[in-house]
């Protein structure tokens, strides 16, 4: 369970106040206008941005006081950040170690991660030899190899076409359910949220709150979000 209490975050005069909320296992869509603070929220939890105040408790520890590498969080960004000169196998292995040589156990773990995202047989290819969807799968495999209980997704599939994006969303849902992860997915697409998100978080007017069940939340748009949804 991830519990947020008295959390304030943002830049300059744009400080967002998050309602006290507890997130259990499941997928949460994070929806709001551009510049509302969606990505900053994820970056604050991950440790890439400092909070103004408050706490984010997981297993009796405040994430906001931990070093980035010690937080139980893995994050996937819009850019897949694959190194073009390295093979897909080596790119994924970087989640475990930067050393050139891996133990047999580590090699098996990398292979298993690639197999899980449907990239078995692509180990020796370079990122430039893969399609956009396959590159997204490789980036997801690298995140999975970190074995973190909280997964933050900052529009990682926004550049993909509808069919490939849906494929990746379905894969995330399958993995989240199997691993009982807490997943926060930033998206501008209500369709994406309806497809895989159990619950929805709205961010607007310097406020972040859990709106509840995704289908119900998107059928009953609050006044603060009317301009965004149109």
Locations of regions flagged by a protein language model:
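Conserved ABC ATPase signature
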Residues: 126-130, 134
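Catalytic Walker B motif of ABC-type/P-loop ATPase nucleotide-binding domains
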Residues: 151-155
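Conserved beta-strand-loop-alpha-helix hinge in the C-terminal portion
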Residues: 207-230
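Conserved ABC ATPase "signature" region
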Residues: 104-122, 173-174
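A short, proline-enriched helix->beta-strand linker immediately N-terminal to the Walker B motif
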Residues: 145-149
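Helix-to-loop junction immediately C-terminal to a conserved catalytic motif
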Residues: 46
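ABC ATPase NBD coupling module
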Residues: 62-77, 98, 104
């Amino acid at each position: 369970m991830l519990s947020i209490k008295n959390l304030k975050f943002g830049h300059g005069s744009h400080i967002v106040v998050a309602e006290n909320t507890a997130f259990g296992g499941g997928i949460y869509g994070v929806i709001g206008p551009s510049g509302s603070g969606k990505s900053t929220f994820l970056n604050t939890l991950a440790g890439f941005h400092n909070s103004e105040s408050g706490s984010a408790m997981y297993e009796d520890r405040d994430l906001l006081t931990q070093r980035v590498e010690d937080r139980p969080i893995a994050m996937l960004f819009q850019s897949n950040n694959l190194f073009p000169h390295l093979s897909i196998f080596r790119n994924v292995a970087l989640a475990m170690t930067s050393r050139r040589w891996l133990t047999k156990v580590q090699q098996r773990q990398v292979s298993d991660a690639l197999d899980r995202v449907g990239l078995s047989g692509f180990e020796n290819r370079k990122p430039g030899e893969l399609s956009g969807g396959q590159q997204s799968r490789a980036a997801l495999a690298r995140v999975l190899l970190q074995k973190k209980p909280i997964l933050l997704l900052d529009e990682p599939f926004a550049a993909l076409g509808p069919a490939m994006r849906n494929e990746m969303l379905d894969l995330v849902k399958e993995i989240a359910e199997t691993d009982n992860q807490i997943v926060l997915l930033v998206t501008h697409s209500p369709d994406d949220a309806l497809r895989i998100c159990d619950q929805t978080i709205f961010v607007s007017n310097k406020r972040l709150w859990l709106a509840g069940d995704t289908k119900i939340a998107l059928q009953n748009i609050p006044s603060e979000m009317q301009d965004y949804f149109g």
